[in-house]
UniProtKB/Swiss-Prot annotation:
Residues 1-50 form the Peptidase S1 domain. This is Thrombin-like enzyme BpirSP41. Snake venom serine protease that interferes with the hemostatic system of the prey. It almost completely degrades both Aalpha (FGA) and Bbeta (FGB) chains of fibrinogen. It presents a higher ability to degrade fibrin clots than BpirSP27. It shows a decrease in the clotting time of human plasma in the presence of increasing doses of the enzyme. Its minimum coagulant dose (MCD) is 20 ug. Acidic enzyme (pI is 3.7). Negative results: does not degrade the gamma chain of fibrinogen (FGG). Optimum temperature is 4-60 degrees Celsius.
Length: 50
């Protein structure tokens, strides 16, 4: 994350995972509309519903 800040360990306690085409990726729910995941989890035209 470029320009990001460190957060408290309890600030974002909710996790999710994504399974697509045989791959698992972890996600962190950072607010009601956004999840944060690693760059290698990017899949074009993917839609995520929570």
């Amino acid at each position: 994350v470029v320009g990001g800040d460190e957060c408290d360990i309890n600030e974002h306690p909710f996790l999710a995972f994504l399974y697509s085409h045989g791959y698992f990726c972890g996600l962190t729910l950072i607010n009601q509309e956004w999840v944060l995941t690693a760059a290698h989890c990017d899949r074009r035209f993917m839609r995520i519903y929570l």
